[in-house]
Structure formats: structure tokens, C-alpha cells
């Protein structure tokens, strides 16, 4: 009995312990599941926060990259601005207080020189370095940029003739790979507007295509010239003229330097040879070294001087340092002297060293044609002796003829020499009724004719409103066939009272064409001037081809 009671108690205790163990395990298992759920939710929340942080980091990284690019761009612009480049940023120059050392509170800070150190008056106006006039497409990335400064002349302007010469000698490909920048270096708005409108009217295609640009400086670009000192025996007016000229060159170079690889300085009173642009490019590319600084394509003044655009900032800075002191050609020579001449060597050694930087091309590609200088009252008859003339086609011989003219011949430039292709014919101003006649020694048949008036040195001395006429030999039947077309009574060739038949006329200084075989043998050929001409006349080429 006592054993049974003990066994029962033991069994009861065991069951109670088992029940408590199961309850505790169940409770523990439930608590453990809750903890896992909590941890899982926290991990999910943490993952979401990490993903959001990653997205925010990417966003901030993009923003930082944009800011970095903006900083790089700003630094690049400032660096280009300091070197004289960055033409597009000039309008913001005066807004940067760092470019005004007198506004900086720290007096011990070092400041690099800028254009404002040499021309402090520019700080008075924000627009002082912005062109007052700018016409064109702003073309960049070309091989050659040609700069032409032009000022008001009291007697005659040669600018449009110069542009005609330069543009007419460019091939279509060259027109796509070059820019001509005309600087109207005057501050009178009426004058600059008139010249600009005239250029736009005469060269609309070139303006629209981007080949031609017209600019003029701000009236605030120039300093007060009344304070200049006379030097080298020049009167004050000449000192003012040469000083302003230096600044004109600087303005033009600063504007053009970011447009192309090479920059060519020209003047507004020149003519150019055919293929001048490709000749200059090839000469530059064929140089055995990149050490050259100036390639010269004319021996006169500042005409036909080619520079590498990368060198323009140095040249501009040097000119600005001494623009009041000496003319441009002296300053250019001084740059070369500073770069390569040894003061301990003699002048011959210096000249040899400078010859490596200043290389001359012959024959000259440009000729000076103006006689009235931009300096008031100055007459200059400068001619480049290396320029030469058009090559005459010696291989052709005109048929024997007696030549005569009613025009008054200038000096030794006779019609006989022109007909023999030894020189050109030059005569004083023609009037209506004047003529140039070629009477053949024996009647002959002509196949074609070609006449060119004007030449590269005097392109304006052309024949205008002039007809080409022939006089058939005594052959009534051939004349009748030539005068009529079918049964029509309308004249095919206008006939003059003295029997000459008009078969052609001059257009832009040139007359060419074929001769109708129906005329048969011809007795004479005549150039007949119909109206008075405002200029002298040059007949540079005469080509009469006999029929086989």
C-alpha cells in the first residue's frame, strides 16, 4: 500500500513535470517565432533603407559630377580668358571681381596680367570688349581665318574690290574651309551700318553660308588718343593712326583666334592670285618644323602674314604692351628678336635666327592696289615687285592682223604688244563710240574668240557694255544665211551701219564664244564700246583661233 502510494505520487510528479515542460517548450517556441519575425522585419527595413541610401548616393554622385563638369568648364574659360582665348566670354569679364586687383581686399595676393592691365579704360563699360556689330554665322573649326581691318578713307574705298578678289579666287571646297572676317574699325554707328549693309547687299550668299563675317568694335574699346606722346619724329596724328592700327589688329586677332588653325592678316586694298588659299595651306603644312612663327606671302607691310592661331595670344599680349610706342611691323620684329636673338652675338647671327621663325614665300600671292592711305592726306604707290603678272599663254599665236584703236594708250602698254601676247593693253577712260579693231591681212575663218579685260593688279579696269563684232568678207550669200534663221525676217545678229555683225558681248570683263561658220571668211573683228566708262581699261588677253 505504501508502495502503491509512492508509485502514484511519482507518476503524478512525472506527469506534472512533463506537462510543465511541454507548456514551457510551447511558450518558448512561440516566443522564438515572434523574435524571428521581428528580426526578419528589421532586416527588410534595413535593406529598404540601404537601397534608398544607395539611390540617394547615386543621385548625389550625379549632381557632384555635374558640379565638377561646371567647375572644369569655368576653369577652362578662365584659363582661356587669361591666355587671350575664349572670345565668347568677354562679355562677362568685368563681372568677375578677381579680374580687378584693386577691388581685392588682400593686397599681398599675386595677380596675373590681363588685357585690363594694358587697357584699364575697358573696365568702365561692360560692353567694351563686345563687338558693336556682328554679322555672319559665327563659323568655327576651319583651316584658315583671314582678317581684314578696314577704316574710313577720304577719297576711295577698296574694300568691296578686295572682297571680290579674295572670294572669286576660292574654290567651293575652300569656301567651306575658311572664314573672312572684316573689321570695320570705326565707331561712328552710321558709317559702320552703311558699310555693313553694303557688304550684306553685295555678298548675301557668302554671309549666309558663313564664309564672310563683319564686325566692328565697341566705341568704348579705344582709349583717349589725345594723351599720346609723339615719338620717332612722327606728328601726333600719325602717332594716333599707328596706335589705333595696333589696337585694330589686336581686336581682330582676339576675335578670330578661336575660329581656325591658321590666321592670315590682310588689308582692305589688295588683290589675290588664283589658288592663293591652297598655296598658303600647303606651304604651311610642308614646313619641316613647327618652330616657325610668321609665314609671309607678300613683302609689303602687314599683308599676307600667316600665324598659327595658338600663337595669337602671345602676339596680342606683346602688341598691347607696346601699342603706344611703335608701329606693328617693328613690334613683330621685336617679338622675333626677343625669342631667338642673343645680345652677345652680332646682327648677322640674329638675322639668321629670325629667318627660322619668319619664312618668306615667293612669288607673292597678294598685291597692294590702293593709292589713298587710311592716314588722311597720305598717297602711297606701294607695289610688290615679287607679285608678277598673269602668265600669258605663249603657246597660241594670233593670226596676222593690223591692230588699231581710238583709245589713248597709257605709256608703253600698247595694243600691238597685247595682240602679240607680250604684255597687256592699257588705255585711258573709254567713251561711247570708241573701238578696238583687228583687220586681218588675209580674210580668214575664225572658230572662236576670247577676250579678258582687267588684270589681277587692276581688276576694276574692265570693259563694260562692249560688243564683239565681225565684218564678213565680200560674200553676200554667207552673210544672208547668217542674218536670217529659216524664213524668219528677224535678225539673228544685230548689224551696225558700217556692216559689222554683233556676235557677242562682255560680261564681268570677259567675252568669249564661237564664230558661226556661215559667216565664211572674215575681214575684221572689232570691239565696240557702247557707253562711257568710269574707269580706265586693260585688255589683258586676246585669243583668236583660226578655223581648221
From Swiss-Prot:
Pathway: Protein modification; protein glycosylation. One of its GO terms (molecular function) is glycosyltransferase activity. Residues 36-83 form a coiled coil. GO terms for biological process: protein glycosylation; protein N-linked glycosylation. GO terms for cellular component: Golgi membrane. The keyword Transmembrane helix applies. Belongs to the glycosyltransferase 54 family. This is Alpha-1,3-mannosyl-glycoprotein 4-beta-N-acetylglucosaminyltransferase B. It comes from Mus musculus (Mouse).
Amino acid at each position: 500500500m505504501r508502495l502503491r502510494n509512492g508509485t502514484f505520487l511519482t507518476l503524478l510528479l512525472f506527469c506534472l513535470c512533463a506537462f510543465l515542460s511541454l507548456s514551457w517548450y510551447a511558450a518558448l517556441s512561440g516566443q522564438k517565432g515572434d523574435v524571428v519575425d521581428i528580426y526578419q522585419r528589421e532586416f527588410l527595413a534595413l535593406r529598404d533603407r540601404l537601397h534608398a541610401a544607395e539611390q540617394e548616393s547615386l543621385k548625389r554622385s550625379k549632381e557632384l559630377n555635374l558640379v565638377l563638369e561646371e567647375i572644369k568648364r569655368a576653369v577652362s574659360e578662365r584659363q582661356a580668358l587669361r591666355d587671350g582665348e575664349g572670345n565668347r566670354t568677354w562679355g562677362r569679364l568685368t563681372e568677375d571681381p578677381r579680374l580687378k586687383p584693386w577691388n581685392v581686399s588682400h593686397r599681398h595676393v599675386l595677380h596675373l596680367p590681363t588685357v585690363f592691365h594694358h587697357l584699364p579704360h575697358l573696365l568702365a563699360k561692360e560692353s567694351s570688349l563686345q563687338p558693336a556689330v556682328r554679322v555672319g554665322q559665327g563659323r568655327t573649326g576651319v583651316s584658315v581665318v583671314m582678317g581684314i581691318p578696314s577704316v574710313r578713307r577720304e577719297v576711295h574705298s577698296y574694300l568691296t574690290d578686295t572682297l571680290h578678289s579674295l572670294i572669286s579666287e576660292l574654290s567651293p571646297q575652300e569656301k567651306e574651309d575658311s572664314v573672312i572676317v572684316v573689321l570695320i574699325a570705326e565707331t561712328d554707328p552710321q558709317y559702320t551700318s552703311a558699310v555693313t549693309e553694303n557688304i550684306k547687299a553685295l555678298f548675301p550668299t557668302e554671309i549666309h553660308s558663313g564664309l564672310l563675317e563683319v564686325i566692328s568694335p565697341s566705341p568704348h574699346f579705344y582709349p583717349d588718343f589725345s594723351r599720346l606722346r609723339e615719338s620717332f619724329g612722327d606728328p601726333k596724328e600719325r602717332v594716333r593712326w599707328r596706335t589705333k592700327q595696333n589696337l585694330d589688329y589686336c581686336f581682330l586677332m582676339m576675335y578670330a583666334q578661336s575660329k581656325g588653325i591658321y590666321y592670315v592678316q590682310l588689308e582692305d586694298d589688295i588683290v589675290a592670285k588664283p589658288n592663293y588659299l591652297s598655296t598658303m595651306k600647303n606651304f604651311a603644312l610642308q614646313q619641316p618644323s613647327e618652330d616657325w612663327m610668321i609665314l609671309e606671302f607678300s613683302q609689303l607691310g602687314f599683308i599676307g602674314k600667316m600665324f598659327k592661331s595658338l600663337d595669337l595670344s602671345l602676339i596680342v599680349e606683346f602688341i598691347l604692351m607696346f601699342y603706344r610706342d611703335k608701329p606693328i611691323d617693328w613690334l613683330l620684329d621685336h617679338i622675333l628678336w626677343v625669342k631667338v636673338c642673343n645680345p652677345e652675338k652680332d646682327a648677322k647671327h640674329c638675322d639668321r635666327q629670325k629667318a627660322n621663325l619668319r619664312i618668306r614665300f615667293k612669288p607673292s600671292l597678294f598685291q597692294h592696289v590702293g593709292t589713298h592711305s587710311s592716314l588722311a592726306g597720305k598717297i602711297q604707290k606701294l607695289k610688290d615687285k615679287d607679285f608678277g603678272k598673269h602668265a600669258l599663254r605663249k603657246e597660241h599665236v594670233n593670226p596676222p592682223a593690223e591692230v588699231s584703236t581710238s583709245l589713248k594708250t597709257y605709256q608703253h602698254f600698247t595694243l600691238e604688244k597685247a595682240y602679240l601676247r607680250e604684255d597687256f593693253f592699257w588705255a585711258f577712260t573709254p567713251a561711247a563710240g570708241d573701238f578696238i579693231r583687228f583687220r586681218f591681212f588675209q580674210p580668214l575663218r575664225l572658230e572662236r574668240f576670247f577676250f579678258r579685260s582687267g588684270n589681277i593688279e587692276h581688276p576694276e579696269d574692265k570693259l563694260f557694255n562692249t560688243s564683239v563684232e565681225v565684218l564678213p568678207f565680200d560674200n553676200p550669200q554667207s552673210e544672208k544665211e547668217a542674218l536670217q534663221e529659216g524664213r524668219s525676217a528677224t535678225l539673228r545678229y544685230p548689224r551696225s551701219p558700217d556692216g559689222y555683225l554683233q556676235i557677242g558681248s562682255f560680261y564681268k570683263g570677259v567675252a568669249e564664244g564661237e564664230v558661226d561658220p556661215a559667216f565664211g571668211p572674215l575681214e575684221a573683228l572689232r570691239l565696240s564700246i557702247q557707253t562711257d566708262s568710269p574707269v580706265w581699261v586693260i585688255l589683258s588677253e586676246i585669243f583668236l583661233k583660226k578655223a581648221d
